[in-house]
Amino acid sequence: MAYTQTATTSALLDTVRGNNSLVNDLAKRRLYDTAVEEFNARDRRPKVNFSKVISEEQTLIATRAYPEFQITFYNTQNAVHSLAGGLRSLELEYLMMQIPYGSLTYDIGGNFASHLFKGRAYVHCCMPNLDVRDIMRHEGQKDSIELYLSRLERGGKTVPNFQKEAFDRYAEIPEDAVCHNTFQTMRHQPMQQSGRVYAIALHSIYDIPADEFGAALLRKNVHTCYAAFHFSENLLLEDSYVNLDEINACFSRDGDKLTFSFASESTLNYCHSYSNILKYVCKTYFPASNREVYMKEFLVTRVNTWFCKFSRIDTFLLYKGVAHKSVDSEQFYTAMEDAWHYKKTLAMCNSERILLEDSSSVNYWFPKMRDMVIVPLFDISLETSKRTRKEVLVSKDFVFTVLNHIRTYQAKALTYANVLSFVESIRSRVIINGVTARSEWDVDKSLLQSLSMTFYLHTKLAVLKDDLLISKFSLGSKTVCQHVWDEISLAFGNAFPSVKERLLNRKLIRVAGDALEIRVPDLYVTFHDRLVTEYKASVDMPALDIRKKMEETEVMYNALSELSVLRESDKFDVDVFSQMCQSLEVDPMTAAKVIVAVMSNESGLTLTFERPTEANVALALQDQEKASEGALVVTSREVEEPSMKGSMARGELQLAGLAGDHPESSYSKNEEIESLEQFHMATADSLIRKQMSSIVYTGPIKVQQMKNFIDSLVASLSAAVSNLVKILKDTAAIDLETRQKFGVLDVASRKWLIKPTAKSHAWGVVETHARKYHVALLEYDEQGVVTCDDWRRVAVSSESVVYSDMAKLRTLRRLLRNGEPHVSSAKVVLVDGVPGCGKTKEILSRVNFDEDLILVPGKQAAEMIRRRANSSGIIVATKDNVKTVDSFMMNFGKSTRCQFKRLFIDEGLMLHTGCVNFLVAMSLCEIAYVYGDTQQIPYINRVSGFPYPAHFAKLEVDEVETRRTTLRCPADVTHYLNRRYEGFVMSTSSVKKSVSQEMVGGAAVINPISKPLHGKILTFTQSDKEALLSRGYSDVHTVHEVQGETYSDVSLVRLTPTPVSIIAGDSPHVLVALSRHTCSLKYYTVVMDPLVSIIRDLEKLSSYLLDMYKVDAGTQXQLQIDSVFKGSNLFVAAPKTGDISDMQFYYDKCLPGNSTMMNNFDAVTMRLTDISLNVKDCILDMSKSVAAPKDQIKPLIPMVRTAAEMPRQTGLLENLVAMIKRNFNAPELSGIIDIENTASLVVDKFFDSYLLKEKRKPNKNVSLFSRESLNRWLEKQEQVTIGQLADFDFVDLPAVDQYRHMYKAQPKQKLDTSIQTEYPALQTIVYHSKKINAIFGPLFSELTRQLLDSVDSSRFLFFTRKTPAQIEDFFGDLDSHVPMDVLELDISKYDKSQNEFHCAVEYEIWRRLGFEDFLGEVWKQGHRKTTLKDYTAGIKTCIWYQRKSGDVTTFIGNTVIIAACLASMLPMEKIIKGAFCGDDSLLYFPKGCEFPDVQHSANLMWNFEAKLFKKQYGYFCGRYVIHHDRGCIVYYDPLKLISKLGAKHIKDWEHLEEFRRSLCDVAVSLNNCAYYTQLDDAVWEVHKTAPPGSFVYKSLVKYLSDKVLFRSLFIDGSSC
């Protein structure tokens, strides 16, 4: 028995140890069967092919997220956002798995090609073309189908059976498979479909309003809809940028605009409504009718994608029941129905109840937010005292662990330092017995200091509050208030007074005598509360600030927002304003509104000076000087008070301007001027305004405009009389131009001293023998002017200003009521039309001459309208219903008709706005139509010194109508009009190109014999007009005179070589000049000017582009695409056309002769021939003069011939030549400079120009050199570099003044023809050892990070680790309609020109950013006198300063030096945008800024050989920056790209493929051909021989996008 037991035990132990073979075989068999069953089950899963190239980590993400599928990863297709694109296929299949096979399904916004390939003939795809991107995607799906069918046809195969039904359906009835209507408006009618209907929405519900979704589903009889969309919980915080790390995408939020994009990609962004998406997330029920709703239920969240389903619910199926007492009661049935309806209403209307009122539901659907709270963090600027606030998500357990612990501290121990120490200790890792224990809470370490301050302040206030409750304000000799302040004083030390003031200001503490009240603010907001608040804010859409009011600075913020509308609000002194409000106890918002009302002329009070300064206001209110005797006064009421102040005191003001400078005490009471004859022999002084006084206008804006118009007539009259008086006083000194406008009659001799060009002048100025001057009404007899005995001379003017102004003044004076103009109640409609839109034609078609009135500015226009209206032979237009404005006002009341039904004013915007208001009132019309052009020549105030405020120039209207189709202008002019007008301007003209220009040798060349001018002759100035008339040309007018006219052909002439202000790119005169012709315009000019540039640009426009502006009728269908492209680049895919010869032709045109250079053996020739070199002090090891032989690998041979050279071999001679041409060739241009003081001033300018004001001082609490910074630096290094540091103990530094020297084997190609005459030097690299870089690398990395965080990124771009898309975003908000100067600073020998001054500037910048003094001194000495050693070439030398091209600060150092250089020379406070990168810079300034002599300053101060270029387009880091009216696009330099295709260093085909991919990455923007025309202009600006290059851009796209085709650009060198 004992043996049996022993044997059994032994056998059992053998089995356990695995020594029993029988048991082992059974276990293996069982394991095998289990594995087979598992693999068979896996094989039965749906199979999905994943062709996109993704990483192993992304492969694991996809596999774990979708275990329902058997995914095969092929990694055969490179694509943008590969993971997201591949996951989209998995998401589609997952949604289709939820639907019974064969049931009718609507795919909202789906991919119909995917369903065809899967053989789903029961799916209808609703694919609306909401934007151009949708059209492109749909065309791509069609292409994929055609590609699939062509492959089958090429292989002799047919469509598989499982696909045949779907493909037959698509071929026969395509609208049954796919439509392009929105889901809400889709009208698809299924054919004999039974069973339930389903729908899926894959990333498409964003664009369907949530309020319309339920009804749209019901209209299609959908039973269940399955949807998927992207979302992130962090969108509910105050962050404007949220990352989706798993798919490398991001959300950015701006108000209600939510933008989704993929990081590091140039694909188009997707814009949605944030409030709409929030409704889909938060709402549970989506009403479809008064009976049915769709209930939403979340299914699962996978890889940043949320899945949910919407189920159709019939609310009539709800249980009907109610408690009752009497069965027979009639109220029973009513109560039952009411209760049931109430129950149904709750289900349909309280749609947010389930999610918003149940916090557990929130925690379930937002698992990351469970037990998380939102804690506010605060910061304050020491300079400006401005407070900033942000929010972070922190574990609730962590918050209360800290609060509960620090609440136990004694009063002396409760300090900020102790709180921070405790918070850091519970967050840090702990090492126990050599094992690292991770902290329970993963809180970002960068937040610990701010969190500690929040915890500390909250606890401190809570402790004080508890003490107050206990003590009840009685603690012996000291009051509780005194005890509290003592406690706070101990905590804060010397900072106590400011802390006390801060607590009082924030109203966290209030003091009233000895009583003290403390309010402890809420510490946090839960995620559930934030979700509820965000959702309700999006539904109700109020202007709600959901932040806790923990500071009263919110009021000040709103006040400053109110003030931000003012011009130059950035210069507003916020501190002074704040102190004023505090000291006077004034509400900041009230004060801000008053300031804005006065300074923006919205207070009903207009000050005609520029700014309401103290001096100007005092001048407006001061007493006036005494008037001279004999003054003629135009007044309409009695005046009692002797001054303007008196009038203001009693609440009324005299009509401005009628009295000039004269005081009211000199007015004649009740003196009225009944007729113009009363002006006869009035003293000239009474009409001449010697000085324009500070006038105050009151009343509504229309009244103020009308008063200003009366003043303008007075000013015009006084100016005309003054000019005639001046001529009489000095007749001999009149120039030729003035003589043509005036005449002077000598009364004694009856001769004209200056003969006037016209005759029978109605008015003149008379000089008497007593040297008195009077205005006189002239009469004529047989001998001429009738004169008086005491007259000496008479001056007349060919202009009728005196007579017309007097007549209009007389009329307007009669219209005044108690000195105030009357404003009509008629409706005023502004018809804003482009040139040639048919404004006159429209007036004639709408007018009824029996009851309407037409007013025009000039006689010619009035005659033209009468002629066109009476062309049928029936006289309908007469001088009674078609008048000039002057005639109507001068003869008002003399016509038989005084009232009109409608008033039409042609070219009304050329009139003074007050004049228009008077015309409307005088016509007594019911409605007035003012036809004009807001971009053409407006009313011009021609009286120098007369104030015409800017807000007076805007006509007050009730309605605005636009006309944007021109019947006159050809297509090229229409292209120009689109730059000037909002909205799309179209043309009905069949003429495409009509403008041309000709530069003439001088003004003398223009004469009728040698240069006959075709068509209508126009000029810009009166002097040019008179010159042409004097030379024999006829019918010549100025541009201003012919506004509104139309001519077949126009010759525009400029004879004035000096600058003319009205000839500018944005000038209305240029617009009028370009838009007068219907067939042709030719511009003859003696100088280059902006109009020449405009015409040259229009001449280069392609015909297909001009076809876009062609319209056959007046409908403007193109207006519909405005919303598609607004604020983003238009994308037009570039056709893939062209050949290698296109690239070669383009290169040869741009750089003629470069491709013929045979430079393959230049390096060999230099080594073999004698050479003479001038060398500075250096040591040469001649044993290294002969390089060691190496095996030569024959590279691939390029088919494109460029100036590229073969890689050179390392050697003493090659390295020495490079060192001589670079390190030994530094310029010496600088003058005598006080280095330290000048460097300090330059750095002051640098910080003031580029850094945000609140970040100009370093954060001394942050350590620059730490373990974290070293680890960050090590992560960027290669393994070889880290290996070099294995024996470095970081105790002592190697010699910091010792550098190694080497060079790049591949010479740099220059985009010029210098290769034809010189041997290019190689680029040298001077670098430290890795041990020194390990010290300074992390240090400068942290300093660089601080610098870039402090830069004003809205205006300045320091190009470090930026993508082309980020460059486009930075320059994207440039307004192309605003005239700008684009500046580039070109510096040669930039690195080697830097001397002691540059070193001092850079050191001062780093020092102010927090660079430690000892290491700073070490770094400075390491860049002063330095030793260079080239062990390969055997060269050793010494250089002073210079930029080391391999130093840790090479790139950022060069960047800050170029920025500091420009800040010291240019007015950076005026800059619009600025970008800096190494030695490259690009600046955008407002047009017309004055710049100093940059070359002189750069030479003397900076030792730079510099040139400042002004360009139309920027060139930055090898890329052209093309700004346009919708944003900005960055094109890689196509010539540089072609130059790289001639590379002779490509080793093999694998190296070639890597080369192609790198070129594809930088040249991706060339795929967009929408802005090729602007790119042509930009290239031509640099290379004047460059032809239009769209053909070569398309060729580059073709070859770069096809790796097989790209191989044809090279041939194998080993086979040659």
UniProtKB/Swiss-Prot annotation:
Residues 1380-1493 form the RdRp catalytic domain. It catalyses: RNA(n) + a ribonucleoside 5'-triphosphate = RNA(n+1) + diphosphate; ATP + H2O = ADP + phosphate + H(+). GO terms for molecular function: ATP binding; ATP hydrolysis activity; mRNA methyltransferase activity; RNA binding; RNA helicase activity; RNA-directed RNA polymerase activity. Residues 830-1085 are annotated as: Helicase. Residues 964-1116 form the (+)RNA virus helicase C-terminal domain. It comes from the Viruses. This protein is translated as a fusion protein by episodic readthrough of a termination codon. When readthrough of the amber terminator codon TAG occurs between the codons for Gln-1116 and Gln-1118, this results in the addition of the RdRp region to the replicase. Heterodimer of a large and a small subunit. Interacts, via its helicase region, with the Nicotiana tabacum arginine decarboxylase 1A (ADC1A) C-terminal internal region. This is Replicase large subunit. It comes from Tobacco mosaic virus (strain vulgare) (TMV).
